[in-house]
């Protein structure tokens, strides 16, 4: 199943913790996965959802 990226709607500020970002995406936003990705000009928490 293809996953599409979407910036986290509940994360604020710079993303410096992959585990915290992933947990927040999964628990709060019902995403499949999450990670800190560099999106100019800073790292952001990106959630991955089924497309």
From Swiss-Prot:
Sections of the chain in a coiled coil: none
Family annotation (InterPro entries): Defensin_plant, Scorpion_toxin-like, Scorpion_toxin-like_sf
SS bond partners: 4-51, 15-36, 21-45, 25-47
Key word Phosphoprotein present: yes
Pfam families cross-referenced by the UniProt entry: Gamma-thionin
Pyrrolidone carboxylic acid: modified positions: 1
SUPFAM superfamilies per UniProt: Scorpion toxin-like (SSF57095)
Keywords: Antimicrobial, Disulfide bond, Fungicide, Phosphoprotein, Pyrrolidone carboxylic acid
Listed Gene3D superfamilies: Knottin, scorpion toxin-like
Record PTM Phosphoserine, positions in chain: 8
BP terms from Gene Ontology: defense response to fungus; killing of cells of another organism
Signal sequence region: none
Entry's family note: Belongs to the DEFL family.
Biological role stated in the UniProt entry: Possesses antifungal activity sensitive to inorganic cations.
Quaternary state and interactors: Forms oligomers in its native state.
Name the UniProt record assigns to this protein: Defensin-like protein 2A
Organism, scientific name: Sinapis alba (White mustard)
């Amino acid at each position: 199943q293809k996953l599409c990226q979407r910036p986290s709607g509940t994360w604020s500020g710079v993303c410096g913790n992959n585990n915290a970002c992933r947990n927040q995406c999964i628990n709060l936003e019902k995403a499949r996965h999450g990670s800190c990705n560099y999106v100019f000009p800073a790292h952001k928490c990106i959630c991955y959802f089924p497309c």
